[in-house]
């Protein structure tokens, strides 16, 4: 059985096959100080983009299974991104700022979405509204870290194999794990987001092997 754990590629930057807009860097770590990201227009036409930041509620899962909470909906957000909108000429680069508002107790992961927006006026201009077409969006990854960081992992055996959980306050990178003798790619486990690893025999370095219900 293929292990249910999401490998490291599951929590990555979401990019279309081609996009005029780019982010540098695409993976950002924020501590107590503000960080900046460069938004680049690689296209040959002006771009108007909207920017949103959302907390990832279940980091470590496949991209399609991610659950997001917009920071704008939070009563007391810990991180803020500004500006919300910007216009970029062809080849232009502008700076986006990520500012921590409050310290976090555990590592918190966000999606930073930059969406190009094109206004379409049509044959008749309407004063009250305008049609809007949204091009392919670009999504970066932001990790906000606590001041004091602890890495720890627990492994709980169950009838399907094992369940791994980060018991520290930051992500734990699991390397060298095997399922039924087959090596897994390295993967991250995040605090508050345990992952199942299914198989007859699940071996996580530093922990006793787990045997699924079909194992001995």
Task: Give residue ranges: language-model regions.
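Intrinsically disordered, low-complexity regulatory regions in eukaryotic proteins
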Residues: 19-89, 93-109, 113-216
């Amino acid at each position: 059985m293929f292990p249910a754990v999401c490998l490291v590629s599951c929590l990555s930057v979401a990019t279309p096959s081609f996009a005029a807009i780019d982010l540098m860097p695409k993976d950002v770590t924020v501590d107590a100080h503000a960080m900046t990201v460069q938004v680049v227009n690689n296209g040959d036409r002006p771009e108007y983009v909207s920017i949103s930041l959302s907390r990832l509620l279940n980091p470590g899962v496949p991209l399609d299974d991610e659950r997001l909470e917009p920071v704008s909906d939070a009563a007391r957000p810990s991180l803020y991104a500004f500006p919300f909108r910007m216009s970029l000429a062809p080849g232009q680069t502008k700076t986006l700022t990520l500012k921590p508002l409050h310290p976090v107790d555990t590592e918190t992961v966000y999606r930073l979405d930059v969406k190009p927006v094109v206004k379409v006026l049509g044959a008749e201009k309407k004063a009250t509204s305008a049609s809007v077409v949204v091009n392919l969006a670009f999504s970066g990854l932001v990790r906000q870290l606590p001041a004091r960081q602890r890495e720890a992992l627990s492994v709980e055996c169950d009838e399907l194999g094992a369940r791994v959980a980060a018991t520290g306050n930051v992500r734990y990178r699991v390397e060298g794990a095997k399922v039924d003798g087959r090596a897994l790619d390295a993967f991250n486990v995040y605090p508050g987001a345990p992952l199942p690893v299914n198989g007859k025999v699940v071996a996580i370095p530093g922990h006793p092997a787990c045997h699924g219900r079909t194992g001995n």
